[in-house]
Structure formats: structure tokens, C-alpha cells
Amino acid sequence: MVDPQFASNFYFDQRLNIDAVKLLPGEYFVTTREMVLSTVLGSCVSACIYDQQSRIGGMNHFMLPSSENSSGFPIECARFGGYAMGILIRELLKNGARKQNLVAKVFGGGNVQPAMVTSAIGSQNARFVKKYLAEYEIPILAGDLEGFYPRKLHFFPKSGRVLLKKLHVSHNDTIAKREKHYSRLLLSTVKPGI
């Protein structure tokens, strides 16, 4: 059975001339193929983790650091960093990566919604991913975290190469609308006590 949190939005990126997968919040993807993994990040974070020797890599896209249900058990959903990081690493290892060869590049965690500045979700996500990778002794080779801008990210898992574009939004509220939509979706799908 295919994990429903495994990204499935495949397309051909004509500008980059390569097969691609677009990751939405709460998704992850692992591959050995020559392709690009892409996403757009606001307050969310993506960890791009790859094995430099076996050339296998993957990426996740999570919305919040972690969550627990009313019984104190972690919620197994890739929208939350704890689960998203764990499943990405497990899938990399299951597909042939070796723990000692894993390295990471991390992006996102912007505080892009004025209303969210007080809760600083982006900063919480950024701190979480750095702490998680340090605890698992996976070095961070590069990253672009926090700030006030959304980012468009392209990750080439076989080589570890990243293309990053900061989206300087002036009158376009698309990212903010998406962030609000995903936040509402998150609240409606995670029920207390589950």
C-alpha cells in the first residue's frame, strides 16, 4: 500500500527539463531517480536529506513542529515535524541510504503572515528542524530559515543541489491565503483524543 502522505503530484518541469514532483504540506518523497522535488514554503519547513554516497535523497514539507493527542501520544501525520522527519529518514534508510552518509539542507520557517508574528510558527519550525537533525547527528550543509519571505524550492536528490528563490510579495496574498487554508485544514483533520 502506498502511504497517502507520499507526494504524488508528478509533472515535467519544462524550464528545468526534468521530471518533477511537487510536495504539498504534510507530504514527503524519497527517490533514487534523476528528478527534482519542488515546493513553496511560507512558515512551513522542508528538510532535504540525502546520502552523498548512494545518491538517494528525499524531502518533506511540514507545518508545525510536533503535536500530541489528548492522551499525550504523538500524532502520526507528516504535517507535524516529528513525524515528517522520522518517516523521511526511515524511508531513506529503507531504500538503501546509510545513516552515517546522510546530510541535510533546510529551508522555510518564514514568518509570512502578520497575524502569525506573535506565535512565530515559522521560527518554531526552524528551531525544531535544527534541533532534530542535531539530535540525530545529521549535519546541516546549507539552509535558509526564518525571515519574512516565502520561498520556492527545487531540490535535486541525486546530487543534493538546491535552487532557491525568495518570493518578495508586495500585493500578492496567495501565500498568506494558502497558509490560512492549510492551518484550517490542519485544525479540522486533527481531532482531540485521536
Swiss-Prot record:
Single Gene Ontology BP annotation: chemotaxis
Annotated EC: 3.5.1.44
Keyword Repeat: no
Classification via CDD domains: CheD
Residues annotated as transmembrane: none
Keywords: Chemotaxis, Hydrolase
Pfam families: CheD (PF03975)
Stored HAMAP family: CheD
Reactions accelerated catalytically: L-glutaminyl-[protein] + H2O = L-glutamyl-[protein] + NH4(+)
Organism: Nitrosomonas eutropha (strain DSM 101675 / C91 / Nm57)
InterPro entries on file: CheD-like_sf (IPR038592), Chemorcpt_Glu_NH3ase_CheD (IPR005659), Cytotoxic_necrot_fac-like_cat (IPR011324)
Source organism superkingdom: Bacteria
Keyword Hydrolase on entry: yes
Xref: PANTHER family: CHEMORECEPTOR GLUTAMINE DEAMIDASE CHED-RELATED
A single MF term (Gene Ontology): protein-glutamine glutaminase activity
SUPFAM superfamilies named in the record: CNF1/YfiH-like putative cysteine hydrolases
Known function: Probably deamidates glutamine residues to glutamate on methyl-accepting chemotaxis receptors (MCPs), playing an important role in chemotaxis.
Protein name: Probable chemoreceptor glutamine deamidase CheD
Similarity field: Belongs to the CheD family.
